[in-house]
């Protein structure tokens, strides 16, 4: 897997990162510890060097900590988060951020994390993020307790505003470098690059819309009918051409986003292998052009997330 610098942090990260939300069980579906360990070990064996987790992801941190025993911790850039602890459980106070870091260190069986981010900032009033949470992160970095700090979230406007206001090392945003939307490339990257901030990309398949079964989840997906209709057209085109739409979506997002890394979350070792293959396989440019011609109705459109109404 190709490595690239994570902005100015001095960290080198793989083009594909492993997302551990599906490994924690609970809200994110069934996954036992043995299955989680197989996925982590497969990722490391394939050359993935960045693993992304969070207290919000059920048992993911604890399972990841056990999976990284035996010297494996030294092989990864470990990223975790604070601020979100459940579907409706948010706390961005300085004390909770600090105690959350300590709990994560204990569960992950490590004495440091490389990347520490606020999780889903759009669910908390922005003044709390600006006045309390980000300063708490910066203090932890100043004390040497974490190497790099940043924020994660969906709304492009919020992410860009925080990048411009604070000395953030990295940001993560999702579903904005897809076959449906290139906001990461056109809006986030220019601001991030101007401020020396690295960008992590996620949700290449647009939270499931760009999969063969994407249509079946439409009722539960936050996207508007316009976005869902564009996704259905992309899925139908790929099916007619005999192409796995999810693999094309991963190819495009990994290879064309311009982000330092693209986080792929899965509970299946085969999907980890497919993501690594997507990073290196040549894209069918003719098919991609046809797919992107279906994008305009959905491009730059967003869905509600937290306090952000889209």
Residue ranges of predicted features:
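Active-site mouth loops of central-metabolism enzymes
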Residues: 22-33, 82-96
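Beta/alpha (TIM)-barrel catalytic core signal, keyed to glycine-rich beta->alpha loops juxtaposed to Asp/Glu
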Residues: 121-310
